[in-house]
């Protein structure tokens, strides 16, 4: 959805949005983690493409906003990485919902297209060295935990 044009032309299906947001995940304090399969996106399949995109965009921005009570203090600025940072409609929704500036990470000189790859490279090095990838304070794991499997192409 280039620049969020499709979502911007749709209407949020509030009933569907409420169903998506009706998850104990949002009321659970960190540490916690989430799987992409946790939500039933089939709820939007009966919607038009425009309304489905608008509803999922609203879900994204509202779900991020619902995390705010779990922060020690409200951020004064949000930096966004990943493909969503190119979606003007999503970025505007986030700014409206959060009530502060929401900018792509390029605003501070970071490469938003490389950041995820850099993070995975860091995790790969941690894994190869047998160092922790997760800690109790970040995901609720019982202790610092490494992970991953190394496969050689030779």
What are these regions (language model features)?
Residues 50, 78, 108-111:
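Membrane-interface transmembrane-helix boundary segments in multi-pass integral membrane proteins
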Residues 76-86, 117:
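Glycine-rich beta-strand-to-loop/alpha-helix junction loops that act as flexible
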Residues 11-18, 86-88, 139-154:
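Short, mixed-charge aromatic SLiMs
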Residues 1-75, 88-99:
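A contiguous, well-structured pocket-lining segment that forms one wall/lid of small-molecule binding clefts
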Residues 52, 64-71, 94, 104, ...:
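Non-transmembrane, aqueous-exposed alpha-helical and coiled segments at domain scale
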Residues 4, 10, 82-84, 130, ...:
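Glycine-centered flexibility sites
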Residues 87-90, 111-113:
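Short active-site-adjacent structural elements
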Residues 58, 106-153:
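Glycine-rich phosphate-binding/hydrolytic loop that grips phosphoryl groups
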